[in-house]
């Protein structure tokens, strides 16, 4: 039984059944692509960064869309590993503990779930497809 399962998880792809299974078995859920940057890769017309619901919540608290999404994860008990190469965004990603989303705001974000993965399907993530040999540690 794993202690942690790292999965694609963001407002547009919430994997609620899997997260519930993790909780049932004491497995920590860790979200990669927690702010939905991956949502722009599948020719989607919608991007979580531009979602009006998320932007409106951010405006209320004076925060970015990314901060709203990170806070949503934290309040749902999910570990997050956001990616950024920009120092100001890395700092911003840590600045999510001075506000709290209401139950209504969490429900609004929960309602954004499309069930559509942004990243590749797990079965296509193979050595042949990605061409990287990862040696034993």
Language model feature labels by segment:
Residues 1-137:
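Beta/alpha (TIM)-barrel catalytic core signal, keyed to glycine-rich beta->alpha loops juxtaposed to Asp/Glu
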